[in-house]
Amino acid sequence: MTSDFIYPEAQSIAGVDEVGRGPLAGPVVTAAVILDPKNPIIGLADSKTLSKKKRMALYEEITHKALAWSLGRAESKEIDEINIFHATLLAMQRAVNALGIKTDHVLIDGHICPILSIPSSSIVKGDSKVPEISAASILAKVTRDREMEALDKVFPGYGFAQHKGYPTAFHLEKLALLGPTEQHRRSFRPVRRALISLTG
């Protein structure tokens, strides 16, 4: 990974990223990672640019080599209650608070930082610039993808294992035909529209 990003002065830095803001179903999942400079991981990149095989290999390496890592989440009902923006910030807070060791600075992918008790910075496209954020993006994506594949077995017919809850044509078709599950986000327009259509 090559980048002109300049790190803040800090002894311990955590990277944070999220996966799952756009889907119509399932949680938004976040991860926080503190890498070990003495035990580097080669090949870190934005999780969306990696093959599933490469993501899985890096997931195993990150969870074994990182000084600390943790996950956060906000469920569909929380997303409906406080909206996806605030739910994402809440999930990021949860991930940072769950880290087992102290960090001096948090680098967060995107434009806005959640309220934290430690200094933080938002980095636009941070998942392609900052290894710690890249690692967090990989952990969050692998975790959420696995959950959606498991959800596919609980609610067969929606294709969760394939589209992971995103609004593909197939998902929208099945949503209109079968109606929303308990994991669908009712505050999202396509889900609300399907619900109204089925209930009259």
UniProtKB/Swiss-Prot annotation:
PROSITE patterns per the UniProt record, alphabetical: RNASE_H_2 (PS51975)
Reported cofactor(s): Mn(2+); Mg(2+)
CDD domains hit by this protein: RNase_HII_bacteria_HII_like
InterPro entries according to UniProt: RNase_HII, RNase_HII/HIII, RNase_HII/HIII_dom, RNaseH-like_sf, RNaseH_sf
Enzyme class: hydrolase
Cofactor binding comment, as recorded: Manganese or magnesium. Binds 1 divalent metal ion per monomer in the absence of substrate. May bind a second metal ion after substrate binding.
Residues that, per the record, bind a divalent metal cation: D17, E18, D109
GO biological process entries: DNA replication, removal of RNA primer; mismatch repair
Organism superkingdom: Bacteria
Reactions this protein catalyses: Endonucleolytic cleavage to 5'-phosphomonoester
RNase H type-2 domain boundaries: 11-200
Chief location category: cytoplasm
Subcellular localization, as worded in the UniProt entry: Cytoplasm
One cellular-component annotation, GO: ribonuclease H2 complex
GO MF annotation terms: manganese ion binding; RNA binding; RNA-DNA hybrid ribonuclease activity
SUPFAM superfamilies: Ribonuclease H-like
E.C. numbers: 3.1.26.4
Entry keyword set: Cytoplasm, Endonuclease, Hydrolase, Manganese, Metal-binding, Nuclease
PANTHER family, per the entry: RIBONUCLEASE H2 SUBUNIT A, RIBONUCLEASE HII
Family classification: Belongs to the RNase HII family.
Role: Endonuclease that specifically degrades the RNA of RNA-DNA hybrids.
Name recorded for this polypeptide: Ribonuclease HII
Native species: Hamiltonella defensa subsp. Acyrthosiphon pisum (strain 5AT)
Source taxonomy: Bacteria, Pseudomonadati, Pseudomonadota, Gammaproteobacteria, Enterobacterales
Protein's gene: rnhB
